[in-house]
């Protein structure tokens, strides 16, 4: 672990943003995902190179930092390798690989933004007509962020959590069953309802992370 774990309690959000400087997205790596048939037996490294063929290394992060970039977002699909018992337990090997990549950045004193990113189509469950299906989305979201926040609770402000990416808003109506193609979803939320649920999701995220303690 290359992060000191010491929080600067006096640092404001504006000051933190200035320290983060220019950012870069480590795209098409740990957020890569596919069907159960496509990814059966995958290791974390298999997922990481599923959409492109170059695993992230210390050299990767050193090179990024050499161009003056001081923060990196690590988009992550946490459903990869999770348990199938309905408890949404994230595989420990997957946690370890994410942490390894984080430490590549921390070795350069960089900042890391970690989120739930795409992660297949389960976000569309938030807009399903069936309330029981919507609850499944809430259960997964809470289980994921509880585990993520607990796992990384002792890192300093060099680790920043982001609730989600473009899955929020009208994407909450996505076709999570893959019953159709194209960009139109099958959810029943109105536009106003989509953004009300988005606000609710983000507040839930804050509440979950804060409740885990540590440096959160």
Summary of predicted features, one role per range:
Residues 18-22, 68-70, 108-112, 153-159, ...:
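Short, well-ordered coil/turn segments that N-cap beta-strands
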Residues 1-71:
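N-terminal carbohydrate-binding accessory modules
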Residues 24-29, 75-77, 115-119, 162-167:
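Active-site-proximal beta-strand/loop segments in catalytic clefts of secreted hydrolases
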Residues 48-53, 64, 90, 133, ...:
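Pocket-edge positions in alpha/beta enzyme catalytic cores
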Residues 56-121, 140, 198-213:
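Aromatic-lined substrate-binding rim segments of carbohydrate-active enzymes
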Residues 27, 54, 81, 125-126, ...:
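Enriched - but not universal
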Residues 135-216:
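Active-site region of glycoside hydrolase catalytic domains
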Residues 36-45, 78-96, 120-137, 172-187:
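Surface-exposed, active-site-proximal loop segments in enzymatic domains
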């Amino acid at each position: 672990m290359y992060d000191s774990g010491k929080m600067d309690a006096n640092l404001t959000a504006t000051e933190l943003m200035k320290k983060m400087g220019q950012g870069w997205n480590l795209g098409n790596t740990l957020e890569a995902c596919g069907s159960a048939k496509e990814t059966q037996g995958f290791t974390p490294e298999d997922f990481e190179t599923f959409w492109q063929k170059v695993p992230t290394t210390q050299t990767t992060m050193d090179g990024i930092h050499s161009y003056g970039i001081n923060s990196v977002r690590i988009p992550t699909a946490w459903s990869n390798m999770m348990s199938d018992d309905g408890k949404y337990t994230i595989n420990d090997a997957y946690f370890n690989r994410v942490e390894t990549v984080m430490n590549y950045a921390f070795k350069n004193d960089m900042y890391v933004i970690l989120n739930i990113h795409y992660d297949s189509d389960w976000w569309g469950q938030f807009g399903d007509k069936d309330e029981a299906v919507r609850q499944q989305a809430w259960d997964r979201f809470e289980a994921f962020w509880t585990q993520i926040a607990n796992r990384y609770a002792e890192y300093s402000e060099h680790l920043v959590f982001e609730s989600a990416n473009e899955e929020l808003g009208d994407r909450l109506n996505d076709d999570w069953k893959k019953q159709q193609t194209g960009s139109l979803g099958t959810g029943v939320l109105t536009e106003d309802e989509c953004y009300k649920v988005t606000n609710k999701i983000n507040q839930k995220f804050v509440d979950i992370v804060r409740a885990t303690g540590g440096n959160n």
